[in-house]
């Protein structure tokens, strides 16, 4: 058994935690949703984020590979909906290690 003192340390970037989303919401595991359902769920999650003071979140939308025409449905709808909100600063595709094209990272700036 190797001594813990001599085990190789995993290198970390001191800025990694700054870029990590503070919370995530997974549409992908909710089954079939109407646009009204997607909007309601997003609003509930956003309200919770506002209450907790969270400014960076991850929406897991899936890539749409199993949708009717093999095209994403949730991601474009949620992206358009979020961009219509005045407190949304930025919406962009998540990093590869966070789900890539099946996710949206969102930055909020809620009014005081």
Where are these regions (language model features)?
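Long, charged, low-complexity intrinsically disordered regions
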Residues: 1-112
